[in-house]
Amino acid sequence: METAILTGAGLAAPAGLNAYIPLLVLALADRATDRVTLHGPYDAISSNVGIVLLVLLLSIEIAVDKVPGVDHINDIIQSFVRPAAGVIVALASTSGVVSISPAIMVLTGLVLAGSVNAVKVTSRPAFTFGTGGILNPFVSMAEDGIAVVTSLIAIFVPFLVIL
């Protein structure tokens, strides 16, 4: 039970940086490992269609997030998507654990992804203004890297999430 909660929380936080990386990591972990088992309706995430859709959305997100100015518009739009993705990964990670209230996981996913997203959305314009947008692609790549690493930690070493 604790592992599922930590995995859910650990996936929700990076969803605030990039909605699709934690979802894709969760889907691939369900398909390729025994670390996560998604139960209905969340098993749709790891279906062939789900994975293809996540790869497509991730590709768009990665490309758009590297362009100064466009990245800010994307961040505003994604301010609704990222917290929702945080909720989905938190719920999906704990869907097989009966003793966890879904309401707690909804709140966990919303707060963690929403908080991380709020920091991203408010700090990005400062990078754009301060550097004329030159650093935006590098900041975006760093965010993507952090999202990948923290998502993998949440799946494979969930107790590190509390650090």
State the predicted function of each range.
Residues A15-A19, Y42-L54, Q78-P83:
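Helical membrane-embedded segments and adjacent short helical loop/helix-boundary regions
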Residues S59-H72, V121-T128:
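C-terminal ends of transmembrane helices
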Residues L6, A12-D30:
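The first (N-terminal) embedded transmembrane alpha-helix
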Residues G10, I88-T94, K120-A126, S140, ...:
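Generic transmembrane alpha-helix signature in multi-pass membrane proteins
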Residues A84-S93, P102-S123, G145:
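Mid-bilayer segments of alpha-helical transmembrane spans in multi-pass integral membrane proteins
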Residues P102-L107, F127-V139:
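The feature identifies polytopic integral membrane transport proteins across all domains of life
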